[in-house]
């Protein structure tokens, strides 16, 4: 395995042009940020108390800003390996559009503003958890786990699972079982989702010296672990129905989606070589995104329908 030892001097020297707003938006990882907003919205809607729309909206903005800050700080620290990996070479820092110091300052200021804002508009317990989430993603995952263990995405995946809890805590002032259920779904979903991509991009991770599971333990072990985690994910995806805050319709949907996820995982497990192995892995990667989106979208839809005046049903 190769390890990164070069400095970021060349990257900084290349960032001689004035960065555009689009470059700073790219630093915030907008795709990841949009998923964070969506899962956080779910956390807001499942809260048992009446949510002031202004507080709810401001809390979502603060959480989104915290996610964006995490992305910017991640790109600042990872700019050396981003310059090596094909899938990340066009990011703002390795592409020379944003200097590392600018990305660091942007991320730090945005992180501070997000935490302070959430504290003032919601409560300081939620703000503290948001601060911990940013710290966990940037320091625990990015600076430590990512480059030191093949279990990086297993432990580090907790950072992506915290937003629904932060949002729930912001509007309800406490954390209860429904919020923890959303955390569990995202936490268990993350490893098979990312390992499916890692099977295809193993060469990229190898060049950058990142000890992903396929590079350290081999693709066969990775396929086995993808299947095991998916078998665990399927029933966990149904917990919103089991514990009573989602409807039987959600239960049926999550059961069906879980079955399709298992089918994809079995195909990944059986396809061991060649282009076919890459194709089934990418299909699972793509479907895993749809899986998570549909689960959370179903919960959001049920909650919104329950709030409409034409609905006589109470929230599940």
UniProtKB/Swiss-Prot annotation:
<keyword id="KW-1003">Cell membrane</keyword>
<dbReference type="GO" id="GO:0008495">
    <property type="term" value="F:protoheme IX farnesyltransferase activity"/>
</dbReference>
<feature type="transmembrane region" description="Helical">
    <location>
        <begin position="280"/>
        <end position="300"/>
    </location>
</feature>
<keyword id="KW-0997">Cell inner membrane</keyword>
<dbReference type="InterPro" id="IPR006369">
    <property type="entry name" value="Protohaem_IX_farnesylTrfase"/>
</dbReference>
<protein>
    <recommendedName>
        <fullName>Protoheme IX farnesyltransferase</fullName>
        <ecNumber>2.5.1.141</ecNumber>
    </recommendedName>
</protein>
<feature type="transmembrane region" description="Helical">
    <location>
        <begin position="180"/>
        <end position="200"/>
    </location>
</feature>
<dbReference type="InterPro" id="IPR044878">
    <property type="entry name" value="UbiA_sf"/>
</dbReference>
<keyword id="KW-0472">Membrane</keyword>
<feature type="transmembrane region" description="Helical">
    <location>
        <begin position="53"/>
        <end position="73"/>
    </location>
</feature>
<comment type="similarity">
    <text>Belongs to the UbiA prenyltransferase family. Protoheme IX farnesyltransferase subfamily.</text>
</comment>
<feature type="transmembrane region" description="Helical">
    <location>
        <begin position="120"/>
        <end position="140"/>
    </location>
</feature>
<dbReference type="InterPro" id="IPR000537">
    <property type="entry name" value="UbiA_prenyltransferase"/>
</dbReference>
<comment type="pathway">
    <text>Porphyrin-containing compound metabolism; heme O biosynthesis; heme O from protoheme: step 1/1.</text>
</comment>
<feature type="transmembrane region" description="Helical">
    <location>
        <begin position="251"/>
        <end position="271"/>
    </location>
</feature>
<dbReference type="GO" id="GO:0005886">
    <property type="term" value="C:plasma membrane"/>
</dbReference>
<keyword id="KW-1133">Transmembrane helix</keyword>
<feature type="transmembrane region" description="Helical">
    <location>
        <begin position="98"/>
        <end position="118"/>
    </location>
</feature>
<feature type="transmembrane region" description="Helical">
    <location>
        <begin position="153"/>
        <end position="173"/>
    </location>
</feature>
<comment type="function">
    <text>Converts heme B (protoheme IX) to heme O by substitution of the vinyl group on carbon 2 of heme B porphyrin ring with a hydroxyethyl farnesyl side group.</text>
</comment>
<dbReference type="InterPro" id="IPR030470">
    <property type="entry name" value="UbiA_prenylTrfase_CS"/>
</dbReference>
<keyword id="KW-0350">Heme biosynthesis</keyword>
<keyword id="KW-0808">Transferase</keyword>
<feature type="transmembrane region" description="Helical">
    <location>
        <begin position="32"/>
        <end position="52"/>
    </location>
</feature>
<keyword id="KW-0812">Transmembrane</keyword>
<dbReference type="GO" id="GO:0048034">
    <property type="term" value="P:heme O biosynthetic process"/>
</dbReference>
<feature type="transmembrane region" description="Helical">
    <location>
        <begin position="226"/>
        <end position="246"/>
    </location>
</feature>
<dbReference type="Pfam" id="PF01040">
    <property type="entry name" value="UbiA"/>
</dbReference>
